[in-house]
Amino acid sequence: FDSTMTRVTRAALIIAIFIGLEKLLGFLRQLIIARQFGLSAELDAFNAANNLPDLIFALISGGALAVAFIPVLSEYLEEKGRPIMWDLFSRVANLVFLATAVLSAIIAIFAEQLVGWQLGIAPGFGAPQQALVTDLMRLNLIATLLFSVSGLVIAGLQANQHFLLPALARSMYDVGTLIGVIILAPQTGYQIGPITLPAFGMGIYGLAYGTVLGAVLFLAIQIPGLLRYQFRWVPKINLRHPGVQQVLKVMGPRIGTVFFIYLVLIYIPDNIASRLLTGSITALAYGWLIMQLPETLIGTAIGTALLPTISEQITRDERGVFTQSLNRALRVILALTLPFSLLLAMVMRPLVNVFGFDLVGTEMVVWTARAFLIGLAGHSLLEIAARAYYAQQNAITPLWASALMMVTFSVMALLFSKLIGVVGIALANALAFTGEAILLLYLLNRKFPGLSRLGSTLPRVALACVAAALLVYFILSMSLPLPAFISAVIALAIGGLAVLPFVWPELKLMMKL
């Protein structure tokens, strides 16, 4: 048991380190984009153009299939060996690539109608902006086709307990998009010391071409991993193959779940935001980006590392070990996310100022990010709760939970956006996802008693929040002879250190995950 949990800890640390690198590169990319385009109609168009391509990836090869695929691949690897596992992988990958190609072609043909339709992507945009969305979306579909394969490669490598290259792939994607931002988009070259970088002057189109380049690098970096684990491609598609049917059985409900999540994260927010102030869609994108930094470092890293192991535990019918694994993960996530969400909200304005938005834009992003942070713990807990069901190859319960979440979010987003604008959409997101996480954990605890037994974790976390918040408030109120951004980072770091003594038991648990 201890060796298994240590393996999960190592994997989580690897994933967290490379997610941190990816987020650093992503932050740099978004910083440069903000300085180039601001909260502009062009950038709103680019963000809106990602919607349908992202949905195809999420439904077919990304969130829908990858999470459902790993438990089945782990079972095949455990019981039938690696060659049989890769045979199944090839059959599913061939099917997914074909389905993605067909859907991408259909969307490219009808892109103009999908953008301008009242229930479409951006009905609130004017005709020139809608035309720009159409062009950019067609370019992004090329990247989607590449991601249809690379998303499955991640599942194949993680089923083999290999996490390094899938984690590094995120950063390679950011390298490609950075090239788009720094070289392809600008009208004049960036100056780095004595070197002037070339500039292709593509404007917002440069970001789309950078996305395609990033998708190429995302796939290429993982090829050595396939070779290491003796991957052999099988040029076959067989829907009657028992493994393919097993994957599709789990994938069907998972597609519904991811579709509801897409509605909540992208379609409904952007549809509503396109009718609000210019820049609202981009404010949502930046607010979400800020919340996603700690969420992916904590929730995604732990959840991704945990899934192959808890899938093995279910295969071996180790219910007690499964329950303990999840309980430890939940306690660690609460101990880290609750204090961090509060402290990050307190230092938000100096952090957002570095993007260079005007006063109105800065306020939009600050309060949108703060609203998203209310759901940081909920989003992170959901990373664990959902994977606990997929480890059992149960995709029905998360489907119904996400459907309920979508309805709840829709009502709250419409109401809150009328009261407080784009911030209300982010607040609705936080409350809806937190409610979904609580529901799934409640149902899990009924099946696995003791799973949500938190002991003294919450009282100690509450004390940590109070102590750290007071300390950060004191530091921010001082007139330090430093730039506001540096003062905010120092306050955040000191506040984080103040949290450590209160959550030390959970930090020790993290090393045993």
Predicted regions, residues:
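Membrane-embedded alpha-helical bundles of multi-pass transporters/translocases
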Residues: 1-513
